[in-house]
Design a protein with these regions (language model features):
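Helix-loop-helix hairpins in multi-pass membrane proteins, especially solute transporters
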Residues: 81-214
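12-transmembrane solute porter fold
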Residues: 22-38, 43-45, 58, 239-243, ...
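Central cavity-lining transmembrane alpha-helices of secondary-active solute carriers
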Residues: 66-80, 130-134, 317-329
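Helix-breaking motifs and short loop linkers at transmembrane-helix boundaries and internal kinks
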Residues: 55, 87, 108-114, 176-177, ...
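Extracellular/periplasmic helix-loop-helix junction of adjacent transmembrane segments
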Residues: 46-74, 305, 310-314
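Structural signature of transmembrane alpha-helices in multi-pass secondary transporters
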Residues: 36, 65-68, 72, 123, ...
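Interfacial helix-cap and linker-helix signal at transmembrane-aqueous boundaries
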Residues: 50-51, 82-83, 168-176, 230, ...
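Hydrophobic transmembrane-helix bundles of small-molecule transporters
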Residues: 152, 174-283, 289, 296, ...
């Protein structure tokens, strides 16, 4: 069994930080999470400026956006279990260093390939930090109600970071250049490093359990194969299906190995807990729908409605405010209504809030947009908080790192696949919907069909009536693609809400006993 030795451990073995110390730890963890959450969405607003500067292809643009999530997802389980064994504080500090170096490299990337590589390194740093934030919360907040409050704050910060990312990106792109959205991380990390070294629970984790490197490798290759294969298959590459099947086979080998090992890397008994499974599934499917749509909506505001980066970010403020409100009130809703009602209600609210966007075209609807963003932000965050509280409360402390890593894997896998799948759907619908404009050559039309940002660039170069006609047609084609992704998301969210309503217990009592 793993035992954790930390500063501030009570004499009776209670691992909570004394007094207000644990709330200071929570503040630091939330600030770390805020940095990563902002980084996940800050690029959305910068896409048009980045496209104009680096001129990536549509495939390269999707890789720039979602390589972060595709790298984070397979590494979370490995780093989560390493944190359980060798110390979460060490992993967080190392993650800060990697994240800082990668941020500087991304800021000054001269080519799309260089930016993709830097974003991948950012994913490595993020994977080192994220599981530790949840598992340290689980470590220092042992009272379930107090932990629910802490998770509510953590969830609100995650929502605020993801929602405020476009606002930060809008301000930076408006006044500097697209690379500033990454460079801003460096001075923040310079402040975080000494603070984390002083505040986070120290000591080391002692364990007689061996750490199985082969299992770690299988989990990384399996998840990466699934994500990469699905992405490539969606883009029409024939090798994608082969990679997907290879990933599935590798994960099957991983599961088989975990069942045979006396000390598995991932305790599969966690998945025998209905609440744990419901939480993980809810996170995966909810984030899948949210992240891909958020990217499309950011482009819709700028390239279809004509907003500047800052104006688009301001329009998305209701999403941020509602997300914070959902994070802060979600714990109370969960206690009052239970897991089933809270999760299914949040999913249903999100699906209903997305539905009006199917009537939008190339004209703005500011009031309707505000109400839709409020419903989406609140519904998504309540769902994610309910899922997170259920996952961590149904898990003994010795497995907190594995549980946190599993949740974060679901989150990042959902984010990466959401961008890949929904982005691919948009591209598949957009390209054939953009008919040839008289007077514009085939080469220019092929470039315009790469993406709406490319079409805007071509239209600007052509100018005149032809350029205006091309931009108008491209905007209509993009709206058609956006509607397709919204339909897929609404169906997915609605189906998940029904599944939760019928299959999940009303109130989970798992996890009140922290013993393994």
């Amino acid at each position: 069994m793993t035992s954790v030795v930390t500063r501030g451990r009570h004499a009776d073995g209670d691992p909570r930080a004394p007094g207000a110390g644990r709330w200071s730890i929570l503040a630091l963890l939330c600030f770390s999470l805020l940095l990563i959450a902002v980084d996940a969405t800050v690029l959305h607003i910068a896409v048009p400026a980045l496209t104009a500067a680096l001129e990536p292809s549509s495939v390269e643009l999707l890789w720039i956006i979602d390589v972060y999530s595709l790298v984070v997802a397979p590494l979370l389980l490995t780093f989560g279990t390493l944190g359980d064994r060798y110390g979460r504080k060490r992993l967080v500090l190392a993650g800060y260093l990697v994240f800082g170096v990668a941020s500087a490299a991304a800021a000054f990337a001269p080519t799309p390939s260089a930016l993709i590589s830097a974003r991948a390194l950012l994913g490595v740093g993020g994977a080192m930090i994220m599981p530790a934030t949840l598992s340290i919360i689980r470590q220092v907040f042992t009272d379930r109600h107090e932990r629910a409050v802490a998770l509510g704050i953590w969830s609100a910060v995650a929502a605020a970071g993801a929602a405020v990312g476009p606002l930060v990106g809008g301000v930076l792109v408006e006044h500097f250049w697209w690379g500033a959205v990454f460079l801003i991380n460096v001075p923040i990390l310079v402040v975080l490093l000494p603070s984390a070294a002083r505040l986070l629970p120290g000591g080391r984790t002692r364990s007689d359990r061996p750490w199985d490197a082969l299992s770690a490798l299988l989990s990384v290759l399996g998840i990466l194969g699934l994500a990469f294969g699905l992405k490539e298959a969606g883009a029409g590459h024939p090798g994608g299906a082969v990679v997907f099947l290879a990933g599935a086979g590798t994960l099957a080998w991983f599961v088989h190995r975990q069942r045979r090992l006396p000390f598995p890397l991932l305790d599969l008994d966690l998945f025998r807990r209905p609440a744990f499974c419901a939480g993980v599934g809810g996170v995966l499917l909810t984030v899948f729908s949210l992240v891909g749509l958020e990217l499309m909506l950011a482009q819709y505001l700028q390239l279809v409605l004509g907003d500047s980066p800052l104006q688009a970010a301001v329009r998305m403020l209701p999403l941020m405010i509602a997300s914070i409100a959902g994070g802060l009130t979600g714990a109370r809703l969960l206690r009052r209504f239970g897991l089933r009602a809270t999760m299914s209600g949040g999913l249903a609210l999100t699906a209903l809030s997305l539905t009006p966007t199917l009537a939008w075209g190339t004209e703005g609807h500011p009031i309707a947009l505000t109400f839709c963003f409020v419903g989406i932000g609140f519904g998504i965050q309540v769902t994610l908080l309910a899922a997170s509280d259920t996952i961590m409360s149904s898990t003994p402390e010795a497995l907190a790192g594995s549980a946190a890593a599993t949740e974060e894997t679901a989150y990042e896998l959902g984010a990466g696949l959401g961008v890949a799948v929904l982005g691919t759907i948009t591209t598949i619908v957009y390209a054939p919907s953009l008919a040839r404009i008289p007077g514009i050559g085939p080469g220019a039309m092929d470039q315009a069909r790469q993406s709406l940002a490319s079409a805007a660039h071509v239209a600007q170069e052509i100018g005149g009536a032809g350029g205006k006609a091309l931009l108008a047609a491209a905007r209509l084609a993009f709206v058609s693609g956006l509607h397709s992704t919204i339909v897929v998301s609404v169906l997915l969210l609605g189906t998940t809400a029904l599944a939760v309503a019928f299959l999940v217990p009303g109130r989970s009592r798992e996890g009140r006993d922290d013993s393994p």
